[in-house]
Amino acid sequence: MPSWSAVSFGALDLRGTELGEQGFDLVVVPARPAVPVFLMGRGAEVWLMIAQGRGGELETDEEALEVLSSLEEMGIASREPGHSAQLQGVTQPWLVSPIHELVYALLAHVAAAHDIEILFIKGPALHAQGLRSRQHSGDVDCWVQPGDDLRLAEAMRSWGWKPLYSPFTGTGVTHSLTLDAGDWGCAIDVHTRFPGIDSPPHASFDIVRAESEPRVFASTSCLTPRVALHGIVAALHAVRPFVGSPAGAAELEEASAVLRAAGVETIELAERVNAVYALEEPLRRAFPAEARSYESARPPADWGWRLTASAPRRHLRALRTVPLRKKPAVILRLLWPTVAMMEAAGEAPGTSWRRKAATRVQRVAAAVRRLLAMR
């Protein structure tokens, strides 16, 4: 008899949880594109046995062999020796939402299958590290190298996520690419940098990766930043400008409180990733005895357009930061976006060619009017 193994892109033991009280024993993400499978009764028992390496006990159990065949069809059991998605054990959920926890594991497996280095930032890990009181996040934030965001976004299509591309995608202007949740109900933000960190994206990723540690999500080992580095990320999130508005007193106090909780090591790390312009005041408040002056610090490249309230002016300022060779394509997409870009912006371009063209013409006319009004 071939040796059976439990395979999965994420799995949780639900016994003792609210879902367990409803009769579900396990939830397992198949090792191929599909929705999570909820197991109970004999199916859960057999799957757990092969996950524990006890498949040999089932060799003469005809009922168990039929169950194994069904599990194989579901994509959660395999007779392939050394399967890349073989699971050795199953953990219980520690996130408020088990489905969100499965998304972390799924992303880690999909990224590994495409040779993409991936880190997970913000979210429940901040709560676990004592850096925020809120436990749950509505989406999952991950961080990859520039260019890998597009590869990961396309790889996640088959799992039900849709990338929301913008005219600035791939130019370095946008710091993340959002993947629409679909049936999973959990959006994903794929970061290639973080606002306020002004070191080159590849270099900052390397620093964050070096300052990360393993954390298990849905039976899968993932990487999240250590406390000090994660404190910098959380503080930057608090103080970044939003639609023309700079950080106010509440945001500055929130950032300083996070940095204080993360420890004095954040000063050196902020200097290493070049986040001192954005964090100078919060760092001074958090650590007055160790306060340093950063008079030569320059605003991050995206701070200018983030502080611009007018959408046309914001687009123009952002356009100035785009490499020259990419500007024509960005201008074209700003004026004449793809249907997917219009839908991502919340517009309804219609289904007919005529309606789509009319919507685009209306956009061009509106853009011209706004530009003339700026004069």
Question: What is each PLM-predicted segment?
Answer:
Residues M1-G138, V144-R375:
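Conserved NTP-donor binding/palm subdomain of two-metal-ion nucleotidyltransferases/polymerases, i.e.
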